[in-house]
Amino acid sequence: MREIYFGIASYRRPDNQRTLDYLERMGIDREHIIMSVQSAEDKAQYERAGIGNRVGRLIYRPGKNVSDNRNTLLESVPPGTRLVMLDDDINAVCKLDGKGLRKIESREEFYSMLKRGYALAARHRTVGFGLYPVKNAYFMSTGYAERNVVIGTLFAIVNTDLRFDAEMATKEDYEYCCKAMRRYGAFVRLNGYVCDAQHYTKGGCEEAWNDKAELFRTARRLAGKYPDILTLNPKRPGEVKMAGKRGGKRK
């Protein structure tokens, strides 16, 4: 199997790197970890905090949002590279185990999940996969969805010319999935795995998520641009859901 690289898009969290801590606990090779920040101030603070000594590359390119930060990661690796993009606030990845969830703590089990995801993406001739969005075992299953949007907490892709929309400060992950589905017909979601993460906490992108007006505009934009894939969610204002039947849930 080709080597896998890990890209962490980080913002204003030099002293609170949960995802990096998690990768280190599992024994992930630091040379395979890339961290991207989007301001010179962040770059200096992260260097002072010693982050540069914990990753293979600490890179910086000016950016205004998480889309720019993710695109910096994509531009840092050659086409065809397997890149697992991660938010910086992940405590652990969890696996459905019976009626509950169990944290993945070993490198071997973590890579087993990644290998399965990449194999399914290749089977369906698409560029990537993600995990179940909500940490609730009741709604999860051991199967997968062939065609679904996924959240960017863990977003594993093969690098192509596809990029995140730099005008989107939120739901940029959904928009990328829609572009991939338009081009390839699929984007895989593993329904038996989910991230335990500290979403919407200080640092990161909490400012963008607190802008409710922008969330509504983004949802309308996505539903208007990809009406064959997404529709507004009437039960959750400011959110979207898959339009029509969801694609191909499989074991």
Give the residues covered by each predicted segment.
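A short acidic (Asp/Glu
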Residues: 17-20, 44-47, 94-97, 139-145, ...
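Hydrophobic targeting segments
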Residues: 2-8, 23, 31-35
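A structural signal for short, well-ordered beta-strand segments and their strand-loop junctions
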Residues: 82-87, 127-132, 187-191, 231-234
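Conserved catalytic core of nucleotide-sugar-dependent glycosyltransferases
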Residues: 93-178
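C-terminal catalytic/acceptor-binding lobe
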Residues: 1-4, 12-18, 168-169, 174-251
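Short, well-formed alpha-helical segments that are part of the catalytic scaffolds
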Residues: 8-28, 41-49
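Short, solvent-exposed loop/turn segments at secondary-structure junctions
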Residues: 11-13, 65, 89-91, 134-137, ...
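Active-site-proximal specificity loops/subdomain of glycosyltransferases
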Residues: 36-86, 91-106
